[in-house]
Regions:
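N-terminal intrinsically disordered/low-complexity leader segments
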Residues: 1-15
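Alpha-helical structural segments
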Residues: 15, 19-26, 44, 61-81, ...
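Helix-turn-helix
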Residues: 19, 27, 33-61, 65
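Solvent-exposed, amphipathic alpha-helical segments
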Residues: 23-30, 73-81, 160, 164-171, ...
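Hydrophobic alpha-helical connector segments
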Residues: 65, 79-106, 154-161
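Amphipathic alpha-helical segments used for helix-helix packing
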Residues: 100-126, 176-181
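Amphipathic alpha-helical packing segments from all-alpha helical-bundle domains
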Residues: 119-147, 196-199
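C-terminal peripheral helix-coil segments that are non-catalytic and often amphipathic
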Residues: 141, 145, 149, 167-213
Length: 213
């Protein structure tokens, strides 16, 4: 059995939580939602399964914090990309598309969001939603400052982007079985990657936008 030494400082607590989250990430990317268990996490960390309960009540809370980590990185990338250069509609869509393609794992995790939220304590959900609100406020402020667009058009853009959050990964990562079934059923399907899908859809969502500069 691993010896457990309780973290005594905020920094130590944060380090332990990050170690748990990183182990969860490795397990999830290799085996999906069902593969993530406290037992599996303990096998990849420096402490035992029971000690994980000192930091998280459920595996979903670990996954919720992993999604928060992904989302913060994604948002930082969006802000960094849009902080300089021209503000044309094309570049706006391209930056979001390129940053999103660099964070595909976030969109994979979004496919399990309902399960994750159902199994998480509300404080973990609130922490994630706070960053989500930050994104909404930032992107709305950017659109207001740089584009002539009606309120309806801006709302349509946000709604479309939310759909991409949940649907882009499954659409761009069909299994061999899914692809074979589509072909056998005669369903037209043109394989694409996440960046291309994002850019194509975002250009449609912003078709009525006009640059102020």
């Amino acid at each position: 059995m691993k010896d457990f030494v309780r973290a005594s400082t905020e920094e130590q607590i944060a380090d332990r939580r990050e170690e748990i989250i990183s182990a969860c990430e490795e397990i999830y990317l290799a085996g999906g939602y069902d593969a993530v268990t406290f037992k599996a996490i303990s096998e990849k960390t420096s402490f035992s399964r029971p000690s994980i309960y000192n930091y998280f009540d459920t595996k979903e809370e670990v996954m919720m914090d992993l999604l928060t980590r992904y989302f913060v990185g994604w948002l930082d990338g969006i802000k960094g990309g849009l902080s300089s250069g021209d503000v044309s509609r094309e570049r706006f869509c391209r930056i979001i598309s390129e940053v999103s393609a660099e964070h595909e794992n976030m969109f994979l995790l979004f496919t399990d969001l309902k399960l994750i939220e159902d199994g998480s304590g509300i404080s973990h959900i609130i922490a994630f939603k706070g960053h989500f609100r930050e994104f909404i406020e930032y992107i709305c402020g950017f659109m207001d400052a740089n584009f002539h667009a009606s309120e309806q058009s801006r709302e349509g853009f946000l709604e479309g982007l939310m759909m991409l959050f949940y649907g882009s990964y499954p659409h761009t990562h069909l299994s061999d079985k899914q692809t074979a079934a589509m072909e056998a059923a005669g369903v037209p399907y043109a394989p694409t990657d996440l960046r291309t899908l994002f850019y194509r859809q975002l250009m449609l969502f912003t078709s009525s936008f006009r640059s102020m500069r």
